[in-house]
């Protein structure tokens, strides 16, 4: 079995990284834009009704090409993530995950990309698929978690450029990692072994395993915490989306216990929770692999290989998440964001930290950007970013903390930076 799934493969080229920040945008890129409202009336359990289109004027694209470079391993880059935990006055820093490396870049305010660190896994056969940022609770040093084909989670101390934690438990590849939004020591992982695990990276214990009786029946491809860190949404190859709660008394007790647990002083292993039953589950949203999911308040954004991101809500529109009934798979579709030529899996969209802008690439190097109206997600401004040198599959996009920089990574080992033309996106 190949270590990289068929849709993840790309030609290997042993070329050195080259920075292209001096190239002229006028000669290298074309950008098509429009402002549209593509929505579907809310329909229970995936009931589809005709779309409504609003008339609006075209406007300039929000982002402009700045530069790109190519990493010297020449293989596909599957993951990219900005460090949103840094202050407003600190440099914008992001990481890429591809081959057996994680590269850390700085985005200077004047433009360009600056490589500041490269972590190479000791296993040359490793292929990293994902990365996520946190920090050390004792030293405040930035920490980067990464994982992939080998199923081993590495937690890297950026200041020391070395792994300070290695977590083995998943039986197969790990497709995505996410840190808890409020507790920096809690890490979530979703795997090819059909399971999701919650870890405490401070005490190195596995707090919970989500899966089993009513868990995913195939690879878990994407996971996400809600903003309060009380619920988890997961999606996978089984076409399903599942909601898991971690705000119950049992979970709160185990999370608290994990903070002080010392395996060297305990005669028994940590009592890991085995959670077999999700709070909610549905297969009515998508008909193919669901490879990306993120919370949008109490709504959910998810995508499959169907040229559409779906905004939906578990249960009926009037219900809160706490009012969901067990074994009730009903859901309400709020809106759809359509795009072209992205019919392969493991292509993930990016959400800016304040949930106002979504960006997704396709298999031919184009990136679609939607600016959402917080009061009504059915009304959006959309634009398409395109550079004639970018022709490879765009695997993932990411926004800086203030959304002034958009980066994406491709199958040909390239990293692209685009800058916002103005400062209309405000942070709290």
UniProtKB/Swiss-Prot annotation:
The keyword Transmembrane helix does not apply. Phosphorylated. Residues 45-61 have a biased composition (Basic residues). SUPFAM superfamilies: WD40 repeat-like. Residues 1-19 have a biased composition (Basic and acidic residues). One of its GO terms (cellular component) is nucleus. It is found in: Nucleus. Keywords: Developmental protein, Nucleus, Phosphoprotein, Repeat, Repressor, Transcription, Transcription regulation, WD repeat. Residues 1-61 are annotated as: Disordered. InterPro entries: PcG_WD-repeat, WD40/YVTN_repeat-like_dom_sf, WD40_repeat_CS, WD40_repeat_dom_sf, WD40_rpt. The keyword Phosphoprotein applies. WD repeats lie at residues 72-115, 124-166, 169-209, 215-254, 285-322, 341-380, 389-427. Belongs to the WD repeat ESC family. Polycomb group (PcG) protein. In contrast to other PcG protein, it is specifically required during the first 6 hours of embryogenesis to establish PcG silencing. PcG proteins act by forming multiprotein complexes, which are required to maintain the transcriptionally repressive state of homeotic genes throughout development. PcG proteins are not required to initiate repression, but to maintain it during later stages of development. They probably act via a methylation of histones, rendering chromatin heritably changed in its expressibility. Component of the Esc/E(z) complex, composed of Esc, E(z), Su(z)12, Rpd3, Caf1 and probably Pho. This complex is distinct from the PRC1 complex, which contains many other PcG proteins like Pc, Ph, Psc, Su(z)2. The two complexes however cooperate and interact together during the first 3 hours of development to establish PcG silencing. This is Polycomb protein esc.
């Amino acid at each position: 079995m190949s270590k990289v799934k068929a849709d993840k493969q790309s030609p290997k080229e042993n070329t050195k990284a080259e920075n292209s920040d001096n190239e002229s945008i006028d000669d290298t890129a074309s950008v098509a834009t429009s402002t549209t409202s593509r929505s579907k009336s809310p329909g229970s359990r995936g009931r589809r009704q005709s779309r409504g289109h609003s008339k609006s004027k075209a406007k300039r694209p929000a982002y402009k090409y700045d530069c790109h470079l190519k990493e010297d391993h020449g293989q596909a880059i599957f993951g990219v993530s900005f460090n949103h935990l840094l202050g407003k006055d600190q440099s914008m820093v992001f990481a890429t995950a591809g081959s057996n490396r994680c590269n850390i870049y700085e985005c200077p305010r004047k433009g360009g990309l600056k490589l500041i660190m490269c972590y190479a896994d000791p296993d040359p056969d490793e292929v990293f698929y994902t990365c996520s940022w946190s920090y050390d609770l004792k030293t405040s040093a930035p920490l980067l978690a990464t994982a992939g084909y080998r199923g081993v989670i590495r937690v890297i101390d950026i200041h020391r450029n070395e792994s300070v934690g290695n977590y083995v438990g998943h039986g197969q590849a790990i497709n995505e990692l996410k840190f808890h939004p409020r507790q920096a020591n809690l890490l979530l992982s979703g795997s090819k072994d059909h399971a999701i695990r919650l870890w405490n990276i401070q005490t190195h214990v596995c707090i919970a395993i989500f899966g089993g009786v009513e868990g995913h029946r195939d690879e878990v491809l994407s996971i996400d915490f809600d903003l309060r860190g009380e619920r988890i949404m997961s999606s996978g190859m089984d076409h399903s989306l599942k909601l898991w709660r971690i705000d119950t008394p049992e979970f709160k007790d185990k999370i608290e216990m994990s903070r002080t647990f010392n395996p060297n002083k305990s005669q028994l292993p940590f009592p890991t929770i085995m959670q077999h039953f999700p709070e909610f589950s549905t297969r009515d949203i998508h008909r193919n692999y669901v490879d990306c999911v993120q919370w949008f308040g109490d709504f959910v954004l998810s995508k499959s290989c169907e040229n559409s991101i779906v905004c939906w809500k578990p249960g009926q529109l009037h219900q809160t998440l706490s009012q969901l009934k067990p074994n009730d798979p009903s859901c309400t579709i709020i809106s759809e964001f359509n795009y072209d030529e992205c019919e392969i899996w493991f292509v993930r969209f990016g959400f800016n930290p304040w949930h106002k802008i979504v960006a997704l690439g396709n298999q031919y190097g184009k990136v679609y950007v939607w600016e959402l109206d917080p009061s009504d997600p059915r009304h959006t401004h959309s634009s398409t970013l395109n550079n004639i040198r970018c022709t490879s599959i765009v695997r993932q996009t990411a926004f800086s903390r203030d959304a002034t920089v958009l980066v994406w990574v491709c199958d040909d080992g390239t990293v692209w930076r685009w800058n916002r033309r103005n400062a209309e996106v405000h942070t709290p």
